[in-house]
Amino acid sequence: MTYNTWWIKKDRNFGDLLTPYILDYFNIDYQYSGIESADIICVGSIARHAKDNTIVLGSGMINFRKEKLNPNADWRFVRGPYTRQRVIDCGGTCPEIYGDAAMLLPWICPEEPKEFKIGIVPHFVDYEYVKNTYPDYNVINVINDDPLEVAKEISKCTSIISSSLHGIIAAHAYGIPAAWVEFSNKIKGDRIKFK
């Protein structure tokens, strides 16, 4: 069976582009589709887009109180307990299985040798500011058509500072200590995805 699958492509954002790599890893046959016909959604703060019977694999939210999550979606696992609680609050059921599918990065993209003591992974809205403010640091751009290149750059660091959720998740997946930082107030949502 071929599954219609949706992920956010327009911003070329690291985390958003990981879904096809994860499905490939599990030999799941898929084709990109619009959200209205998606059978599967996976990586990203996209849980609010699940329709009736959409299979949700590790998606999360950006705003706890404002997002209406579809109780009729097939919630296999979600990013964290806040997303699960919101599914339940909206009348759905969801097992107590948590994790962002990006935690599988070390199996998909093996770790690179260490080159940098610190890597800074700004959210794409913060990139220019951080690049210009910290020119002497290894600033990793999450906007890349190949998200595995971003993962490789993160894996080359011994520690990560990030305003990007998937910068932190990737670091944790590779066993790299990571700290979340806010460089601006430009990131959408109520920061629930960082909890």
PLM segments and residue spans:
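Active-site anion-handling motifs in enzyme catalytic cores
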Residues: 1-195
